[in-house]
């Protein structure tokens, strides 16, 4: 199992590395046993959307291990784009950022189980 750690909270995560995985994201999926989805990408401006998603989510942009932008409670299938700069994006079930007080400036640590690298 892979995890991300923000503050003192550990979240199980599914790591998305390929362009195909990035394009699929949470489309047509539920959280089904994971706390988050971690998108590892080249640091630059990225745009995420919730088209074809069936669950609301929080979208968090991360750069150099720090949270730089937070979009809480993104409506599924809204057609809206969520833009930010970063080398990673983390998607959480809606209200996670409020429940765990996740804000810009916090450190994000990715822990990968050796069998999943």
Residue ranges, per PLM feature:
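Compact, glycine-rich, soluble single-domain proteins
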Residues: 1-117
